[in-house]
Swiss-Prot record:
Domain Agouti positions: 93-132
UniProt xrefs under Pfam families: Agouti (PF05039)
Residue stretches of biased makeup (Basic and acidic residues): 64-79
Organism taxonomic ancestry: Eukaryota, Metazoa, Chordata, Craniata, Vertebrata
Gene: ASIP
Domain notes per entry: The presence of a 'disulfide through disulfide knot' structurally defines this protein as a knottin.
SMART domains, per the entry: Agouti (SM00792)
Region feature Disordered, mapped onto this chain: 61-93
Protein name as it appears in the record: Agouti-signaling protein
């Protein structure tokens, strides 16, 4: 009785392994170098060829010029943004990320609030809701 159960269990394991292994397509099966060399079904001529094209000096210069134009336009755009001076606020208030310990005035940003940490020893104005 024990021999029969052992034989049936072995047969069941073999059938499960065979069923799982047979569902793999032939390309995904594991192969070593020897089987690849001996197998004639894998033909290297069937693979698409790769063409390598060298860039000439003119195309390199054009791409460099384009890159320089992009860099200069980015620098000009950043200079234009920085050139705008901010109007000073006449109301006494604390800027964002500035220290706002309790005797200090309120935060300048309407959506900012004063948050304190470490038992109110370090306080700063922070914007909690970006979409405010």
């Amino acid at each position: 009785m024990d021999v029969t159960r052992l034989l049936l269990a072995t047969l069941l394991v073999f059938l499960c392994f065979f069923a799982a292994y047979s569902h793999l397509p032939p390309e995904e099966k594991l192969r070593d170098d020897r089987s690849l060399r001996s197998n004639s079904s894998v033909n290297l001529l069937d693979l698409p060829s790769v063409s390598i094209v060298a860039l000439n000096k003119k195309s390199k210069k054009i791409s460099r010029k384009e890159a320089e134009k992009k860099r200069s336009s980015k620098k000009e755009a950043s200079k234009q943004k920085v050139a705008r001076p901010r109007t000073p606020l006449s109301v006494p208030c604390v800027s964002t990320r500035g220290s706002c310990k309790p005797p200090a005035p309120a935060c300048c940003h309407p959506c900012a609030s004063c948050q304190c940490r470490f038992f109110r020893s370090a306080c700063s104005c922070r914007v909690l809701n970006v979409n405010c």
